[in-house]
């Protein structure tokens, strides 16, 4: 495994997982709001 690839991939993966986490949390809030 090339270390440069890890250095490039790590922040991209962190950013992608953070974005998905935020989208998922917002989606859950919207669903809970619709249920009430």
Swiss-Prot record:
Name of the protein: Photosystem II reaction center protein Y
InterPro entries for this protein: PSII_PsbY
Signal peptide extent: none
GO MF entry, a single one: manganese ion binding
Record key words, sorted: Chloroplast, Membrane, Photosynthesis, Photosystem II, Plastid, Thylakoid, Transmembrane, Transmembrane helix
Organism: Phaeodactylum tricornutum (strain CCAP 1055/1)
Topology within the bilayer: Single-pass membrane protein
A GO BP entry: photosynthesis
Highest taxon of the lineage: Eukaryota
Subunit structure, as described in the record: PSII is composed of 1 copy each of membrane proteins PsbA, PsbB, PsbC, PsbD, PsbE, PsbF, PsbH, PsbI, PsbJ, PsbK, PsbL, PsbM, PsbT, PsbX, PsbY, PsbZ, Psb30/Ycf12, at least 3 peripheral proteins of the oxygen-evolving complex and a large number of cofactors. It forms dimeric complexes.
Entry GO terms, CC: chloroplast thylakoid membrane; photosystem II
Lumenal side: 1-4
């Amino acid at each position: 495994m090339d270390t440069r690839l890890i250095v490039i991939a790590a922040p991209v993966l962190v950013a992608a997982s953070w974005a998905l986490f935020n989208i998922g949390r917002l989606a859950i809030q919207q669903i809970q709001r619709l249920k009430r």
